[in-house]
Amino acid sequence: MKTRRFQQIDVFTQQPMLGNALAVVLDGEGLSDAQMAAFARWTQLSETTFLLPPTDTAADYRVRIFTPTVELPFAGHPTIGSCHAWLSAGGQPKAQGKVVQQCGVGRVRLRRQGTRLAFAAPPRRKDGPLDEATVERIARFLGVQRGDIVDHQHCDNGPAWQAVRLASAAQVLALRPQLGSESDLEVGVVGAYPSGAGRAGHGDGDADAPSFEVRAFFPAAGGGLAEDPVTGSLNAALAQWLIGAGHAPPRYVAAQGAALGRAGRVHVEQEGSTVWIGGDCVALVRGELTL
């Protein structure tokens, strides 16, 4: 047993308990795979991360990302939250103004703009439209008609998201999915707000007014699907799809989490060929654990 530094971070929010919580073990070296998996099950958060010395000389640190059931090669809110914890604990990047994280998909670049961190969206491992049988299955799960889905796309960038676009943000917010009816889908849903009519609340200024509403559903530990409060990996792949297809401008804000009482905000910006996914963080817990 060893005493290790620990933080719990709320990601994609400026206000505590309105984003997506992340557990970060800052001193993960020496823990076995089984110990990491067991601790992630114990936290029961959507993800728990363990920071380690990098094996890639270009990286500043290495991260391993666990859900309560599996290890992930990449995930978005753990990327931003882990970087926030690493920097706040005294981490010094090799290059001023940017951080390089090593994870299961390789290197992920991050940058800081004021208090906000953003990561460079990794390339999608699979894109293109979904097959029709999958689209119909997703429609049944969401409780909508097939015709309500106006577009669809593979958004696999580690997590194998299968994304559908509805005609409006209001339709996304109105969804009442049958969470127990599926067990192996990873479903992302997006819909646009009318211009200038983003969902207000929780101190939104004009700069934070969302252009899109997003919801995400993933396999739950006890069976069926669960809803994720705010999802960086899905928003990254959605941005690549929506901007590339002309459905979104090169800079926008997405809202996520309203159905769970959250108010996540994901800041998207395309620069050249890179899409940056940004968010604020709040550290709610700092301390030590014995593991």
Task: List PLM regions with ranges.
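Active-site proximal loop and beta-alpha junction motif in alpha/beta enzyme cores
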Residues: M1-F74, I80-L291
